[in-house]
């Protein structure tokens, strides 16, 4: 199973990002393939928050369009909406404790905890995931 990070979901949808073409192709291949995809609440709500923000994007998506993307992804047969299990909080807090910081890494820690809990691989263009020793992760856009 793979778990995509917010950045890849944004790059796949928002045409203004330089990574859009590669991310869009990767996401289409992944969603239409056989690999299990685990979507998390932090990634989905992060996508909605950023994709609709005029403070972040010159041409933000209308809320209805962003929600439609989320619903479309969740309707795919190889996509699961993951829920935090009984170890999730302990895993996440342990990761934060090892880092010695929360701040801008809090969402990354949440996603890493899902990855560890579900024995899944995080897909992200954010190299901060390399900080988590017990986590499998890759950047599918790396050339």
Swiss-Prot record:
Q: Where does Mg(2+) bind?
A: 5, 108
Keyword Glycosyltransferase tagged: no
GO BP term, example: negative regulation of growth
Write down the superkingdom of origin.
Answer: Bacteria
Q: Which SUPFAM superfamilies does the entry mention?
A: PIN domain-like
Question: Is Metal-binding given among the entry's keywords?
Answer: yes
Give Gene Ontology CC terms: plasma membrane
Q: Which UniProt keywords apply?
A: Hydrolase, Magnesium, Metal-binding, Nuclease, Toxin-antitoxin system
Pfam families with a match to the protein in the record: PIN (PF01850)
A GO term, aspect molecular function: magnesium ion binding
Q: Which cofactor does it need?
A: Mg(2+)
**EC class (word):** hydrolase
Q: Where are the transmembrane segments?
A: none
What Enzyme Commission number(s) does the record list for this chain?
A: 3.1.-.-
For this protein, the record's InterPro entries field holds: Mtu_PIN (IPR006226), PIN-like_dom_sf (IPR029060), PIN_dom (IPR002716), VapC_family (IPR022907)
What is the protein's known function?
Answer: Toxic component of a type II toxin-antitoxin (TA) system. An RNase. Upon expression in M.smegmatis inhibits colony formation. Its toxic effect is neutralized by coexpression with cognate antitoxin VapB33.
The family note in this entry says: Belongs to the PINc/VapC protein family.
Q: What is the name attached to this protein's record? A: Ribonuclease VapC33
């Amino acid at each position: 199973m793979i778990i995509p990070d917010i950045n890849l979901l944004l790059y796949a949808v928002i045409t203004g990002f330089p990574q859009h073409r590669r991310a869009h192709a990767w996401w289409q291949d992944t969603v239409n393939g056989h690999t299990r995809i685990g979507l998390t609440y932090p990634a989905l709500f992060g996508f909605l928050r950023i994709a609709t923000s005029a403070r972040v994007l010159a041409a933000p998506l209308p809320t209805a369009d962003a929600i439609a993307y989320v619903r479309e992804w969740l309707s795919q047969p190889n996509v699961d909406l993951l829920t935090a299990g009984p170890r999730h909080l302990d895993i996440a807090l342990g990761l934060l404790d090892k880092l010695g910081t929360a701040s801008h890494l809090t969402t990354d820690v949440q996603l890493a905890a899902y990855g560890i809990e579900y024995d899944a691989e995080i897909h992200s263009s954010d190299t901060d995931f390399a900080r988590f020793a017990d986590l499998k992760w890759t950047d599918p856009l790396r050339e």
